[in-house]
């Protein structure tokens, strides 16, 4: 049976600048539970401890978000996203105290070593720990396998490849998922973004390659061009004969029901989202890049290229400002140089 992890109340928070209310969390968690969703992930878009001036502040804290969801769930498991450095061991302790069932410890795809203490902390408490390798397009299959093996050794019960930038094509997904499935003794999962319009296709390919866990959001509600759309994914999975706890009818009822209290809009793939996917930049960076380009008066797509050259990972918003400022200075120097040349030619 394929396990579906619903990130609507976590990754979806990116789409509305992390402003989900307690009432929305409770209503969606209850509806997802009734729809037979396996895991309902809740929190700031960047996970436990993510609320900040830099990343965006939530109107309610982690405790209230998790307590609200916990009270709404009966059969679905409650999950959280945790990035070491943004969150602390105390944040996991709080989540475990409240009754979180699944802690997804996420690191950059080449930094799995920093996940050890947090995976161990979760397992010691008797809860489920998943390892998550973010920005997975930035490492080849052999490197990803080596990193996933570290997480497995630390006690992770599954490893999820996260295509954080929506960069991957089906051939890349197949090669990487197959490598992990062949090399690990634990389940493999896949988390897609739709920047290139491939989220559902990539998720299906991941399942064909042996993945047992897929992430999705109702109506694709998520960062950038959105995540894998839950309803579309379940429909395609039914067509392909994949067994799940939910059904297309249940997730369609879930999607329709959310219009009354959440009303998530299925994201459209804008040129900025395509650029983010093409250049391999974290999907949540799009509004920050657009804002910086406007403030500094520089070309938005040139800024994408510059940031791609810097190989940005999640949590480096300050470098967006740095590169936009550098582009503006270079532009001003070029204009001054061109002005001198024109004056010399006119003399």
UniProtKB/Swiss-Prot annotation:
**Its Gene Ontology molecular function terms?**
2-isopropylmalate synthase activity; 4-hydroxy-2-oxovalerate aldolase activity; manganese ion binding
Keywords from the UniProt entry: Aromatic hydrocarbons catabolism, Lyase, Manganese, Metal-binding
- Active site (UniProt): 14
Q: Does the keyword GTP-binding apply?
A: no
This protein's name: 4-hydroxy-2-oxovalerate aldolase
Quote the record's binding site residues for Mn(2+). 11, 191, 193
**Superkingdom assignment:** Bacteria
> Where is each Pyruvate carboxyltransferase domain found?
2-252
Entry EC no(s):
4.1.3.39
**Enzyme's top EC category:** lyase
**Would the keyword Manganese turn up in this protein's UniProt record?**
yes
Give binding positions for substrate.
10-11, 164, 191
What chemistry does it catalyse, as a reaction equation? Answer: (S)-4-hydroxy-2-oxopentanoate = acetaldehyde + pyruvate
Q: Which organism is it from?
A: Burkholderia thailandensis (strain ATCC 700388 / DSM 13276 / CCUG 48851 / CIP 106301 / E264)
User: GO biological process annotations for this chain's record?
Assistant: catabolic process; L-leucine biosynthetic process
| SUPFAM superfamilies for this protein | Aldolase, post-HMGL domain-like
Task: Give the family per the record.
Answer: Belongs to the 4-hydroxy-2-oxovalerate aldolase family.
Q: Where is this site: Transition state stabilizer?
A: 10
Q: Which NCBIfam families match?
A: 4OH_2_O_val_ald, PRK08195.1
């Amino acid at each position: 049976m394929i396990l579906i992890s619903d990130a609507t109340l976590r990754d979806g928070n990116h789409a509305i600048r992390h402003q989900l209310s307690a009432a929305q969390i409770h209503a969606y968690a209850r509806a997802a539970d009734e729809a037979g969703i396996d895991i309902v992930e809740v929190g700031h878009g960047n996970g436990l401890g993510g609320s900040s001036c830099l990343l965006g502040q939530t109107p309610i804290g982690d405790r209230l978000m998790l307590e609200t969801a916990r009270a709404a769930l009966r059969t679905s498991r409650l999950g959280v996203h945790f990035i070491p450095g943004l969150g602390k061991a105390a944040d996991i302790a709080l989540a475990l105290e409240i009754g979180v069932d699944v802690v997804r410890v996420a690191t950059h795809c080449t930094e799995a070593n920093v996940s050890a203490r947090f995976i161990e902390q979760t397992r010691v408490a008797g809860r489920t720990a998943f390892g998550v390798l973010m920005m997975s397009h930035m490492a080849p299959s052999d490197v990803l396998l080596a990193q996933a093996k570290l997480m497995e050794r630390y006690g992770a019960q599954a490893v999820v490849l996260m295509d954080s930038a929506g960069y991957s094509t089906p051939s890349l997904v197949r090669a990487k998922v197959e490598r992990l499935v062949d090399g690990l003794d634990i389940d493999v999962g896949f988390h897609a973004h739709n920047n290139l319009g491939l989220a559902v296709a990539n998720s299906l390919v991941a399942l064909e390659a042996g993945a047992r866990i897929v992430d999705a959001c109702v109506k694709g509600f998520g960062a950038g061009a959105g995540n894998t759309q839950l309803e579309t994914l379940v429909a395609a999975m039914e067509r392909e004969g994949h067994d799940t706890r939910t059904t297309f009818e249940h997730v369609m009822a879930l999607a329709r029901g959310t219009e009354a209290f959440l009303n998530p809009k299925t994201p459209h793939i804008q040129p900025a989202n395509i650029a983010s996917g093409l250049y391999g930049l974290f999907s949540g960076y799009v509004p920050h890049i657009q804002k910086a380009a406007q403030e500094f008066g520089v070309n938005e797509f040139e800024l994408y290229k510059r940031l791609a050259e810097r190989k940005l990972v999640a949590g480096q918003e300050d470098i967006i400002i740095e590169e936009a400022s550098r582009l503006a200075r270079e532009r001003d120097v070029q204009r001054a140089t061109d002005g001198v040349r024109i004056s010399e030619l006119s003399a």
